[in-house]
Amino acid sequence: MDLSATNHRIPLGDGNSIPIIGLGTYSEPKTTPKGSCATSVKIAIDTGYRHIDGAYIYQNEHEVGETFREKIAEGKVRREDIFYCGKLWATNHDPVMVRPTLERTLKVLKLDYIDLYIIEIPMAFKPGDVVYPRDENGKWLYHKTNLCATWEALEACKDAGLVKSLGVSNFNRQQLELLLNKPGLKHKPVCNQVECHPYFTQPKLLKFCQQHDIIIVAYSPLGTCRNPMWVNTSLPPLLKDTLLNSLGKKYKKTAAQIVLRFNVQRGVVVIPKSFNPERIKENFQIFDFSLTEEEMKDIEALNKNVRYVELLMWRDHPEYPFNDEY
């Protein structure tokens, strides 16, 4: 795979293509200063990123859209150069809500279409505007999940030209097979966005997806933040790993750059999230070196098969995806 800083798109199963590195824009709305996302997207585009990964529930899509318009007006990029991924949240799985939810994202971004729209998690929650619905006792309010019906509503959005490609996130093999075997399937999922890094290499899921022309997009490709609400903090931080740091010394790179290069060489798309200008630039500097076959095997051997992001608060949901082996 001959990838460079200016040419790093890889083909998707529907004939479209995706840049192999993107900027993740996840943020905690309550604690993230206004404008942080816009500044980060500007720096990313100026650095050479063309893929931005976002979601309506991050509450910063308006900043992403403003930055796109600004950079297009400057002549830095054209709309067709930019690849934006949005997400359908768990409270909007009801088929009648799918198109209005996507249209709301388009309105906030002020775009005519987005490049990729994915089901964020395979678990449905009580429909409505409350993102994390619970009852008065704090119990999560779940909703009957019908992934095939949700998918049909997404297919109609693609047919209407609102989105170029459709995908999923946090799906296990069984949930992917449910869609792939759906009677009358019009559009296959082009990607499955999942946690993937040297401590959690996902070999079986990766192989299954490759067999079905589904790209793996790696979230938390550098390990993750240490927020105990989301994260298994008993795991050691990935970027402190001895092997990754010794390879970093060899190539005059950081452990983070080694980790990103590892996944890119496996054909896995990476979307490291950062609002730190230096790290945004650093994460992109992965096209001027390659790891040897031996080094790739050594990094693969670091796999502990343990997730940082377990979503344990929803493990009693009938569609909780992480009980299966993969």
Swiss-Prot record:
What this protein catalyses is: 5beta-cholestan-3-one + NADP(+) = cholest-4-en-3-one + NADPH + H(+); 4,5beta-dihydrocortisone + NADP(+) = cortisone + NADPH + H(+); cortisol + NADPH + H(+) = 5beta-dihydrocortisol + NADP(+); corticosterone + NADPH + H(+) = 5beta-dihydrocorticosterone + NADP(+)
Q: Which GO terms describe its biological process?
A: bile acid biosynthetic process; bile acid catabolic process; lipid catabolic process
Q: List the Pfam families hit by this protein, alphabetically.
A: Aldo_ket_red
Q: What is an example of a GO molecular function annotated in this UniProt entry?
A: Delta4-3-oxosteroid 5beta-reductase activity
UniProt GO cellular component terms: cytoplasm
* Intrachain S-S bonds: none
Q: Output the superkingdom of the source species.
A: Eukaryota
Please tell me where NADP(+) binds in this chain: 22-26, 53, 169-170, 193, 219-224, 273-283
* Name assigned to this protein: Aldo-keto reductase family 1 member D1
Question: Its encoding gene is what?
Answer: AKR1D1
